[in-house]
Amino acid sequence: MKICQLTNSTEKHAVTRSILEALPEWFGIPEAREDYITESGDKQFFCAYDADKPVGFLYLKETGKATVELYVMGVLKEYHRQGIGRELFQQAREAAGKAGYSFMQVKTVQMGRYAEYDSTNRFYLSLGFQEFEVFPTLWDEWNPCQVYVMAI
């Protein structure tokens, strides 16, 4: 397994599409998925490879002068629980710190709504994120937005 930082926007789009389309439990809304794909091109982007096959990625989005957001992350289901997401995060966090950011945030569906998102919440907590705030209707009333934060 190797983690690389990608700079080519076409490659970022292709990786984002292939992985998000394989994860409909988390990325099943076509419009949202297309937005993630489109936005990936100019973001700080990290990709995990098994040989030459992309198996996971994440990208960061600046949300303030001192804050970056772990904007989207996906790891193919057959590669879950192998440390890939954690390694992607560690490299992204290190890069964000070197770039001068002091804080990182991530948004997900609030714990207790869907089993898939409960595991996502537990993963972010295990990385050291802390609960910051819930926006009950930011996305819609069925998907309350949990914001987690951490110091970098």
Task: Mark where each language-model region is.
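Conserved beta-strand in the GNAT
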Residues: C47, K53-K61, T67-G74
